[in-house]
Amino acid sequence: MTLESMMACCLSDEVKESKRINAEIEKQLRRDKRDARRELKLLLLGTGESGKSTFIKQMRIIHGAGYSEEDKRGFTKLVYQNIFTAMQAMIRAMETLKILYKYEQNKANALLIREVDVEKVTTFEHRYVSAIKTLWNDPGIQECYDRRREYQLSDSAKYYLTDVDRIATSGYLPTQQDVLRVRVPTTGIIEYPFDLENIIFRMVDVGGQRSERRKWIHCFENVTSIMFLVALSEYDQVLVESDNENRMEESKALFRTIVTYPWFQNSSVILFLNKKDLLEDKILHSHLVDYFPEFDGPQRDAQAAREFILKMFVDLNPDSDKIIYSHFTCATDTENIRFVFAAVKDTILQLNLKEYNLV
């Protein structure tokens, strides 16, 4: 074999090896691209207290590891703090609304509770338990609770306050429902990834209060679906940030912005009309027509009210080709969310079969 033929042979081996390496790299790049596509980004949007964080907690219960005893124990002081926050809100509202306590001793109880620094609460001492129970049973406080739309009070107030005896026991461990109902305003961005049928669903929850929305902008890339939550029960409530603006009008304005954003042109939109249980309770004594005069359906009819609210939101979509997928939900009800999210998952996968190499 001549030197030239030996060199040609070595060269062709090098070329072959180089080609093989190149092919491997190309293959890996294609694989990486495919794997990246197997991650679906779901952006959870909605105004403050619409139920986004509760929805994320449900995903952890339904599709993740759930909450261990240790995890639940971590919520104990938050439950206590929620109770104090609720009672303090009602004590302040008693003054604002000029409602009198029926029982004289409750003036002293109110003073005791009012002076508590909620953020420093880590235990639930007997004197506070006793004061809160006596206050909650006062007809004045009950009247104040019935007028809660006139001030800011957590949806979980009644749930916790009617169960103070259980929560006050020594060795109290929050239940799954206690965890779901804890209210902690979301500041910043919370991501929760979970794996379903070899596809990663990355759910992103951003704060709903106005001050938090500035932080949304960088979440807008590669969003598969927008999941927009509306609290059905907020039709007669005012904003935390502005007490002369209706919460549902704010929610509508935000939804209109979202469905018309160029960023979201290719993202599917799923509308969750949440807190259907609270609507059913509230509609019996607070009439939708008083806040939305265009409502011409029957009073005290939850079905008519929710269909009207759904239509109000769907009508904000100017693109007739874009379908708004909608579901009525109760985010604190695990079985309801399990059922609804199974349907949502199927919708998202159907819409993205080709894009995400799922076929």
Swiss-Prot record:
It holds the Pfam family G-alpha. A lipid is attached at C9, C10 (S-palmitoyl cysteine). The gene is GNA11. Keywords: Cell membrane, Cytoplasm, GTP-binding, Hydrolase, Lipoprotein, Magnesium, Membrane, Metal-binding, Nucleotide-binding, Palmitate, Transducer. Residues 201-210 are annotated as: G3 motif. The keyword Acyltransferase does not apply. Residues 329-334 are annotated as: G5 motif. One of its GO terms (biological process) is regulation of blood pressure. This is Guanine nucleotide-binding protein subunit alpha-11. Residues 270-277 are annotated as: G4 motif. The keyword Iron-sulfur does not apply. It comes from the Eukaryota. SMART domains: G_alpha (SM00275). SUPFAM superfamilies: P-loop containing nucleoside triphosphate hydrolases (SSF52540), Transducin (alpha subunit), insertion domain (SSF47895). It is a lipid-anchor. Belongs to the G-alpha family. G(q) subfamily. Residues 178-186 are annotated as: G2 motif. Its main location: membrane.
